[in-house]
Amino acid sequence: VEAHLASGRFEPLLVLRRKRQTPQDRVDALRARGVPLHVVPGWSHAATLWELVRLCRRFRPDILVAHGFSDHIWGRLAGLLAGVPHLVHVEHNSRERYTRWRLAQSRWLAARTDLIVGCSEGVRSALLDRGFPADRTVAIPNGIRLERFDPADRHPWAERRQAAVMAARFARQKDHATLLHAVALLKQRGIHLPVTFAGGGKSSHREAAMALARSLDLEDRVTFLGHCPDVPGLLMDHRICVLSTHYEGMPLSLVEGMAAGCMPVASDVVGVRELISPGLDGDLVPESSPQALADSLQRIVEHPEAAARAAQQARRHALERHGLPLMTQRYEDAFERLLHPAAR
């Protein structure tokens, strides 16, 4: 929304659905920054829907963009009821929690939706596999605020800590266990590679990872940092970023690691594999394979010159393809085509 405000091409309004975990301080911070926003009730789908309809009739948008499961269902239903001219659905993950009924609702809405956006080619493919219309389903890759990584070139790869970071929330989707087992294998091989885990998430998953680290006797080389207020600084202090995961949409933490000039190593899964060309700008390893991950990390330790070149190429890739202004331009160009189809 801030990017749309900055571009001046559209008048945006951010609508948030209040949930139990919605942090009020973040809402207040957005308002303090001048972000136009409205919070709708989230205690029931009916309450959300009714307030969205009222808001749409008052604001009278030309386009309603509904993000995320299952909010994209209620958002588009409200848009239909309020007579919003154009509806856009944005999908953020390759493996959303669609039940048969929710999928039927989404397909029904898809026939009345102008544009369906996957945040990566992997997500677009997943949408097509679920039966969404190919002629209106596109990929617009996520972008990040690249300016936070401007100092990366002042942190030469060879002068960084020979250590790895995995910046990811603790959740069932992520695979912290495979990285821990890989570190244990490296220890058996006589290779000392410290690893820092940064991120919040579910305490049960975090505690399970910490217990596994203790059982593998890794307390001398594994750090659980929790929430990190300066992820760019953390990444730019390390040589390697790792994303061990089961599936993704478009992993911004990996893009951030690349922008920070780290050598990226990640699981070869949907939403990830399109980011990395092994041997050129990082490495991909089979999902849930501690052996393969340990082998990859060992190659980086033993061949630092090649890893430094890959890290440099990864940074170039992130800067060229994943900036927030580029993502905003792609969305706004798509919106213009909806509003002015004759200009296509």
Language-model-derived ranges and their functions:
Residues 14-22, 167, 194-208:
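Glycosyltransferase donor-sugar binding loop
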Residues 15-16, 263-266:
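Short hydrophobic beta-strand element within catalytic cores of glycosyltransferases
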Residues 88-117, 130-132:
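A conserved, positively charged/aromatic
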Residues 278-279, 283-290, 299-304:
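Conserved acidic donor-binding segment of nucleotide-sugar-dependent glycosyltransferases
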